[in-house]
């Protein structure tokens, strides 16, 4: 029970916290928007523990989890509402996803890749961070923001989240500027 409460009240960093932009630089790559069903949500923690993830000290926080500690696995509405979607088993490893098709699945791997997306979300504000924290699998949402590249200010290193054979566009970092919850829960994924 304690774990559930800690997940429910987990803090999500956002760009209005003083230490976040002192330690990370964001470079916009383009606009992002879409209507999706949330397949899964996963939290990440940095490799080492500190008192506060957005400390104003520059250079001590070289882990992407200090600016983005939540990933969302999303499916396009057309795909998520189909019975075929239930024949796909998703697994999130590290900061990206992998999938396995059931032997009876009529889908091809390319169809799954074309209709799914894993984002490492960066909240633009405290309000967006609170909304992202409340997101649940099965909900239909609209997200708007920007594709971004994240660089550590102290090392100059860019953070990569896609270490798998999926196309680079399927696992990306997004600065979320707007979040809207739509209607009731849609079809559940297995």
Segments from the language model and where they lie:
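OB-fold and OB-like single-stranded nucleic-acid-recognition modules
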Residues: 1-190
């Amino acid at each position: 029970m304690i774990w559930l409460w800690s997940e429910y009240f987990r803090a999500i960093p956002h760009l209005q916290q003083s230490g976040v932009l002192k330690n990370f630089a964001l470079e916009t790559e383009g606009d992002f928007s879409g209507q999706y069903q949330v397949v899964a949500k996963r939290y990440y923690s940095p490799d080492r523990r500190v008192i506060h993830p957005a400390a104003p000290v520059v250079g001590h926080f070289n882990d992407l989890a200090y600016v983005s500690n939540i990933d969302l696995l999303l499916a396009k509405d057309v795909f998520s509402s189909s019975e075929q979607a239930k024949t796909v088993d998703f697994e999130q490893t590290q900061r990206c996803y992998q999938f396995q098709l059931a032997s009876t699945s009529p889908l091809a791997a390319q169809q799954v890749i074309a209709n799914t997306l894993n984002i490492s979300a960066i909240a633009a504000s405290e309000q967006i961070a609170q909304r992202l924290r409340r997101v649940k699998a099965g909900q239909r949402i609209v997200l708007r923001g920007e594709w971004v590249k994240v660089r550590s200010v102290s090392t100059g290193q860019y953070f990569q989240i896609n270490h798998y054979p999926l196309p680079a566009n399927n696992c990306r970092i997004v600065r979320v500027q707007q979040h809207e919850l739509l209607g009731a829960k849609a079809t559940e994924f297995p």
